[in-house]
Amino acid sequence: YFFAVNIAEEEACDIDTFNTIAYAAILHDIGIHEAEEKYGSSAGKFQEIEGPSVAKELLKDIELQEEIKNRIFYLIGNHHTYDKIDGIDFQILVEADFLVNIYEDEISRESIKSIKNKIFKTKKGIELLDTLYLNNSNL
């Protein structure tokens, strides 16, 4: 969440986009437990299948425009499918997710460089990636 809203602030996103990013960042992995129960796996493709319905249940009583809710569900249902990135909200969510996953998954410096070249586009996302992982001589 922190990385997503930090990048969104730097990108000067409008309030609807910012809210979409914030909710999606909090909820994007919400399908993990359902995926593990149904498929015995928390793989991204299963999270994408299960996540939107779990998020719909959680957000049903939250006052948000339907368009924003639907975009949140779309982002949750596609956040591991990088060729579907179709907007700044999706771009920021993916970059923020990578910033966390690189640390959690102990991704190699060479792989980080590849991710940077293939995925990262926002100025703040690139700055965070460089500062946290590529400018650090301990990696």
How would you label these PLM feature ranges?
Residues 13-23, 62-76, 89:
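Acidic/histidine metal-binding catalytic segments
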Residues 2-14, 27, 64, 79-139:
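Divalent metal-dependent phosphate-bond-processing catalytic cores, especially two-metal-ion Mg2+/Mn2+ enzymes
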Residues 42-46, 87:
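Residues at secondary-structure transition points
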Residues 18-40, 51, 73-80, 97:
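His-Asp-centered metal-binding catalytic motifs of divalent-metal-dependent phosphohydrolases/nucleases
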Residues 1-4, 45-61:
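An active-site-proximal "capping" alpha-helix that borders the catalytic cofactor pocket
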